[in-house]
Amino acid sequence: MNLNQSRRSFIQKSLIAGAGLTLIDPFSAQAMMKKSKMKLGLVTYQWGKDWDLPTLIANCEKTGLLGIELRTEHAHGVETTLSASQRADVKKRFADSSVTCVGYGANFEYHSPDQAAVRKNIEGTKAYLDLCKEIGATGIKVKPNGIPNEVPREKTIAQIAASLNECGKYAGNIGQVIRVEVHGNISQEIPNMKAIFEQVTEKSVKMCWNCNDQDLLPPGLEANFNSVKKWFGDTVHIRELNVGEYPYQDLMNLFVKMNYDGWILLEARTEPADRIAAMKEQLEVFNKMIGNA
């Protein structure tokens, strides 16, 4: 073996070990890295909800999940109540680490028949967009949270889209993104998300695929995926890749096929005894799926 081959082999093996993978075939890992620029990160949904910010960053560094979506009202404490100096400290903590603060996971919603409630959610979205900018993040996750039965569906869809356009204009002006999670009773059905986005005009408003069972309704995963993929942003939410019956390998195949290069964010629901080991396991499963795509 010549020197270049030896060096190439060493680099391949080092990269695999650093990602927490079982050393299978280094050339397969090299092919995987060439094939996709997707990255696995963490939503502080269950596995990170009780970690303060230094612990959260350290645990993500330790496990190779190098992006974080900060879910609202969790132990990280990153909220709009932070002072300017505290916001600067959050930004510095991420900057001094290998972990990216992808954004904020809020519960703002725009479907209510109560217009005062809708306005409160819009203004709350804007306040948290300011927070995201000041901590070095790039956007905020929001969601439709249903479609009320007592209101014509078309009216609610138009109201959600109009709210997203207002928030999106504000976001675009400060270099942020609105990430709309596919969520909510009826609203999470892909044709309804499509109907919302057909009325969205702001380029800073993007869709966050959420791996719901409704994705599989006729005409099926691939057709539903293709019907909305032009609106995808830089985040996707998944659950544990090796738990349940959602066809994650098929989904990863679709993302690789479209050369998706965003964050695949783990929104885990289980309660493992060792969350660090579980995070490492999910990274290994993710890398294998991308390698097989």
Regions found by a protein language model. Give the residues of each.
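Histidine-acidic metal/acid-base catalytic patches
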Residues: 2-41, 48-64, 187-293
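Active-site acidic/histidine proton-transfer and metal-coordination neighborhood
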Residues: 14-16, 20-23, 93-100, 110-207, ...
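N-terminal small/glycine-rich loop or linker at the start of catalytic domains
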Residues: 33-43, 101-111, 147
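Short amphipathic alpha-helices and their capping/turn segments at secondary-structure boundaries
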Residues: 54-61, 84-96, 126-134, 252-254
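Catalytic domains of carbohydrate-active enzymes, especially glycoside hydrolases
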Residues: 56-73, 136
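Conserved beta-strand positions in the central sheet of alpha/beta enzyme cores
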Residues: 69, 103-105, 141, 237, ...
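Glycine-rich, proline-tolerant flexible connector loops at the mouths of alpha/beta enzymes
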Residues: 71-91, 144-151
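Flexible loop residues that form catalytic
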Residues: 73, 109, 145, 240-241, ...
